[in-house]
């Protein structure tokens, strides 16, 4: 029974505030506040309707997007993968071109997995890219994009037409 104190120490460490603080940020909900720096950015939490960070008399908050086919040049990912469809399908949510992903927290790492449509073949192989913690990531969203999974607590902005 000499292992019991070590097990108890590990359990306490796993539940400590620093371990909890390292968890993915909370996924936004309609009506919750968002930072003004995210104004006009959108997010699309898995299994929900897309949200936009909109400003008003009470400040900035996440609002449900009315359009069934939202498209934006600014997206926010919050840790868990956010999957969007590109120009390889009808009603793309993200356009191809040069993008920059900026971590919203110094420990966050932005990453993306892209799958393009290959004419006559179907979906091509995944193309992965990942930035360093706290550092912006520059990437090209490929033409004929089928899907992209964005990860990290990051603001993604299109920088070219």
Feature locations, PLM:
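Primarily secretory-pathway and cell-envelope proteins
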Residues: 22-74, 106-161
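Generic detector of short, well-ordered, non-transmembrane alpha-helical segments enriched
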Residues: 17-19, 49, 95
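Generic detector of ordered secondary-structure context
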Residues: 13-15, 45, 91
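Surface-exposed ligand/attachment interfaces on beta-rich extracellular proteins
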Residues: 76-94
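A generic structural signal for solvent-exposed, polar alpha-helical segments
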Residues: 9-13, 68, 81, 105
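Secretory targeting and sorting signals
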Residues: 1-24
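A short tyrosine-centered beta-strand micro-motif
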Residues: 97-101
């Amino acid at each position: 029974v000499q292992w019991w104190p070590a097990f108890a120490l590990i359990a306490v460490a796993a539940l400590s505030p620093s371990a909890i603080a390292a968890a993915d940020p909370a996924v936004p909900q309609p009506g919750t506040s968002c930072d003004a720096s995210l104004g006009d950015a959108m997010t699309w939490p898995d299994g929900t309707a897309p949200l936009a960070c909109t400003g008003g008399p009470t400040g900035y908050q996440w609002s449900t997007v009315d359009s069934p086919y939202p498209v934006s040049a600014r997206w926010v990912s919050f840790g868990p993968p956010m999957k969007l469809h590109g120009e390889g399908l009808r009603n793309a949510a993200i356009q191809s071109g040069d993008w920059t992903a900026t971590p919203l927290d110094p420990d966050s790492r932005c990453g993306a997995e892209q799958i393009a449509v290959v004419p006559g073949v179907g979906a091509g192989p995944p193309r992965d890219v990942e930035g360093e913690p706290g550092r912006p990531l520059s990437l090209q969203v490929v033409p004929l994009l089928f899907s992209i999974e964005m990860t990290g607590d990051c603001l993604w902005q299109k920088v070219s037409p």
